Amino acid sequence: KRDEDGIVLVDQDRCHGYRFCVEACPYKKVYFDPLRQVSTKCIFCLPRIEEGVAPACARQCPGRLRLVGYLDDEAGPIWKLVHKYRVALPLHPEFELGPNVFYVMPMSPPKLDAQGRPTDEPRIPTSYLVSLFGERVPEVLATLEAERAKRRSGEPSELMDLLIAYDWNQNFALGPRKREVL
């Protein structure tokens, strides 16, 4: 993990292809490249980051689902989603690895019964989300639903504005400091 930006890299020159890192990665993001005979992973478009350009996945995402910024920038969207609204969670917080990636729970429509009517049951089971993101999931889902209800009733919601991302340029704040991704 690089100190200057938090990006985790696999040293291709030192890798012997034993695949221990593939097995050890708690996030299951390292894979074995059979052509080069080394383990590898996403490098977060490091050459782009070094030029101050957003990673390709974030820049090209049609749903504007990826935000890139600094966790300590109180004016930025990452800080607000993680600290102010507390709706962005790390994957597997029980590992206590200080991840650079945070997730906002998906708000899916309810399940439908056999007759096609909506039920009170979520399409993605809450228990499954808890297994991925920890015990705060129900609290996060309640916050998201309350903010969505505010917006539906015509009230303003900074949280919904952040998640809708009308101005996608505000989703990217890059530079030489540590960055977090959502």
Task: Annotate each PLM feature.
Residues K1-R59, L71-D73:
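Ferredoxin-like iron-sulfur electron-transfer modules
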Residues A56-L182:
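Long, compositionally biased charged/polar accessory segments in the mid-to-C-terminal portions
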